[in-house]
């Protein structure tokens, strides 16, 4: 019983770790920036795009995603 409990906890810990690492860069919800009238602030919260470009914040990243027709994805948060 102890062995199966340890195995279960280890499996859960590994799942949480890997889902956080690989899920971080998977998707960004850009719905709030779809309106072309929305202007981006100069807030610094870097996003690294799959194109190797560092975008200043989520808004700037989302505008680039829309301009590219969805070809750019989030590689990770932070500078490239």
Curated annotation (Swiss-Prot):
Q: Determine the domain of life of the protein's source.
A: Eukaryota
| A family per Pfam | Kazal_1
**SMART domains with a match to the protein in the record:** KAZAL
Query: Chief location of this protein?
Result: secreted
Q: Which InterPro entries match?
A: Kazal-type_SerProtInhib (IPR050159), Kazal_dom (IPR002350), Kazal_dom_sf (IPR036058)
- Does this UniProt record's set of keywords contain Transport? no
Q: Do you know which SUPFAM superfamilies this protein is assigned to?
A: Kazal-type serine protease inhibitors
> GO: which molecular function terms?
serine-type endopeptidase inhibitor activity
Q: Which keywords does UniProt give here?
A: Disulfide bond, Protease inhibitor, Pyrrolidone carboxylic acid, Secreted, Serine protease inhibitor, Signal
Query: Residue span of the signal peptide, if any?
Result: 1-23
Q: An example Gene Ontology cellular component term from the record?
A: extracellular region
Annotated Kazal-like domain ranges read: 24-80
> Where in the sequence is Pyrrolidone carboxylic acid found?
24
- PANTHER family from the UniProt entry: SERINE PROTEASE INHIBITOR KAZAL-TYPE 6, SERINE PROTEASE INHIBITOR KAZAL-TYPE 7 SPINK7
Q: What else is known?
A: The sequence of BUSI-IIA is shown.
* Identification of the protein by name: Serine protease inhibitor Kazal-type 6
From which organism does this entry originate? Bos taurus (Bovine)
- What gene is this protein translated from? SPINK6
């Amino acid at each position: 019983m102890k062995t199966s409990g340890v195995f279960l906890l280890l499996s859960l810990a590994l799942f949480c770790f890997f889902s956080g690492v690989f899920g971080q860069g998977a998707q960004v919800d850009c719905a709030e920036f779809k309106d072309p009238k929305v202007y981006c602030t100069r807030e610094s919260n870097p996003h690294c795009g799959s194109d190797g470009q560092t975008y200043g914040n989520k808004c700037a990243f989302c505008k680039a995603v829309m301009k590219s027709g969805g070809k750019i994805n989030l590689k990770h948060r932070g500078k490239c």
